[in-house]
C-alpha cells in the first residue's frame, strides 16, 4: 500500500524505474507492456523490489485481501522518505522460498522504510558526537482496505465505484466528538458531513453520490 501520490517506483540504486501501480514497460527484466498492476502480488512473477518515488504522505503499508488485514508504518516523510516493498514473486522460484520459510502461511511481502534516505544503497553521514533521532510507528489494522491517508491516530480509506464514494475510518484509540467531512475541491461544496459521538473501531461512514 503506497500513498496515492506515488506514480513511479525504483529498484536498488535507481537503476531501473517503472510507472506505478500500472507498469507499462520492462521492470526486473519482465515485460509489463500490456499494462500490469504491480501493486498486486499475484501479478509479480519474479523476485522484485520497488521503492516509492518521493511522497508527501507519512505512511506506507501492506494489506492482505483474503484476511482483510494489514500492517502500516507511519512517520514524518521529511525524516522518513524511504518506502519499500519486496517480494519473492508469484512464480516457481518464489513459491519454493515460501515452502522453505514457512510451514503454512504462504507468500509474504517485506515492508521496509528508510530514515534520511529514499533508496536502499544510499547512506548519510553521522558526524562525531552528532545524534539523530526520530519517531516511527508500526501498527496492525483491519477491515479498511487500501489506505489513502494515515496518522498514528487514524487511518482513512475512500473508494469510488460507479459514481459513488465510500469512506472508511479506522482509529488506533477511542476518539470522541469526531467530525468527518469531504469537500469537492473541483466543483466546490461539501459532499459528506457527519458528526460521531465516538469511534474506536473500523467504521463505514456511508456513500457519497
Model-derived regions: residue spans:
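A general sequence property marking short-to-moderate contiguous segments
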Residues: 132-147
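Surface beta-strand/loop "capping" patches
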Residues: 144-175
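Short amphipathic beta-strand/extended segments with alternating polar/hydrophobic composition
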Residues: 75, 193-195
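Active-site proximal loops enriched in glycine and acidic residues that flank catalytic Cys/His/Asp
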Residues: 113-115, 136-138, 169-171, 184
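Acidic, contiguous internal or C-terminal segments within carbohydrate-active enzymes
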Residues: 1, 136, 158
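A contiguous, surface-exposed recognition patch within enzymatic or periplasmic domains that forms
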Residues: 2-131, 139
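Beta-strand-rich binding/interaction modules
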Residues: 165-193
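Single conserved hydrophobic/aromatic residue that forms the stacking wall/gate
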Residues: 197-208
Amino acid at each position: 500500500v503506497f500513498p496515492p501520490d506515488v506514480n513511479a517506483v525504483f529498484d536498488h540504486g535507481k537503476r531501473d524505474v517503472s510507472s506505478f501501480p500500472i507498469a507499462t514497460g520492462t521492470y526486473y527484466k519482465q515485460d509489463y507492456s500490456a499494462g500490469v498492476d504491480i501493486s498486486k502480488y499475484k501479478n509479480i512473477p519474479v523476485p522484485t523490489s520497488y521503492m516509492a518515488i518521493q511522497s508527501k504522505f507519512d505512511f506506507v503499508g501492506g494489506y492482505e485481501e483474503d484476511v482483510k488485514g494489514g500492517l502500516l508504518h507511519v512517520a514524518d516523510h521529511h525524516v522518513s522518505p524511504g518506502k519499500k516493498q519486496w517480494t519473492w514473486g508469484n512464480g516457481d522460484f518464489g513459491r519454493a522460498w515460501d515452502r522453505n520459510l514457512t510451514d503454512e502461511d504462504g507468500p509474504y511481502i517485506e515492508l521496509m522504510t528508510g530514515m534520511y534516505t529514499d533508496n536502499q544503497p544510499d547512506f548519510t553521514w553521522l558526524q562525531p558526537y552528532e545524534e539523530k533521532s526520530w519517531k516511527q510507528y508500526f501498527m496492525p489494522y483491519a477491515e479498511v482496505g487500501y489506505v489513502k491517508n494515515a496518522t498514528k491516530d487514524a487511518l482513512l480509506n475512500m473508494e469510488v465505484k460507479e459514481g459513488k464514494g465510500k469512506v472508511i475510518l479506522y482509529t488506533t484509540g477511542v476518539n470522541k466528538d469526531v467530525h468527518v467531512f469531504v469537500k469537492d475541491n473541483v466543483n466546490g461544496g461539501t459532499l459528506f458531513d457527519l458528526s460521531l459521538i465516538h469511534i474506536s473501531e473500523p467504521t463505514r461512514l456511508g456513500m457519497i453520490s
